[in-house]
């Protein structure tokens, strides 16, 4: 896409490299606050913009026995607290179209998980919120195919679209091909 996307005071563009980081899944308010504060301290020291990322539901876990997260209501309350107490933008995954509007009331960025990056209804629902959307490239897609995911969101008049290189599957391994970034721009 090769353009600038603003998320609060964080700018994504050709001259900046913001960090999206945090625990994969929300464990507790205390843990989330501690992680956000620690990462913020480090990124401020090196002058790197930072968005806190954590998920209220990891719906794509391999095992049914794995911890999925606190649920949407509790997770959004925790993300809201992180956002206000630490003073940073927050990002979280959405898995279903009917989650997008509620999540956009708290999250500064809606993230589409890699395995859901071609789900038209989800992409359109996320785009319709007007909130910036980060689409993780599916391991099964070439970077050229990501333009179709971005175009689905763009049909909603939301131009605040970010694409994240997630890697490519080679057998059972996952390899990140950094040349994909320039193609997806």
PLM feature spans:
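N-terminal amphipathic alpha-helix/helix-capping segment at the start of soluble metabolic enzymes
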Residues: 1-19, 77
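Short, well-ordered coil/turn segments that N-cap beta-strands
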Residues: 14-17, 46-50, 84-90, 106-108, ...
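Catalytic beta/alpha-barrel core
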Residues: 70-71, 85-99, 108-121, 132-143, ...
């Amino acid at each position: 896409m090769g353009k600038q996307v603003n998320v609060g005071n964080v700018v994504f563009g050709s001259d900046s490299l913001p960090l999206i980081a945090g625990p994969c899944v929300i464990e507790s308010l205390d843990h989330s606050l501690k992680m956000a504060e620690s990462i913020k301290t480090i990124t401020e020291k090196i002058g790197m913009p930072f968005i806190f990322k954590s998920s209220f539901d990891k719906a794509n876990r391999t095992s049914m026995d794995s911890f999925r997260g606190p649920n949407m209501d509790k997770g959004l309350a925790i993300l809201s607290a992180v956002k206000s107490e630490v003073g940073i933008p927050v990002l979280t995954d959405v898995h279903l179209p009917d989650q997008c509007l509620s999540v956009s009331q708290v999250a500064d960025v809606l993230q589409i998980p890699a395995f859901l990056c071609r789900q038209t209804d989800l992409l359109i629902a996320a785009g319709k919120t007007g909130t910036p959307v980060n689409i993780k490239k599916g391991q099964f897609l070439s970077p050229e195919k990501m333009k179709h995911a971005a175009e689905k969101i763009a049909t909603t008049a939301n131009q605040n679209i970010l694409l994240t290189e997630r890697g490519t599957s080679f057998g059972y391994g996952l390899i990140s091909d950094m040349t994909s970034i320039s193609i997806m721009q």
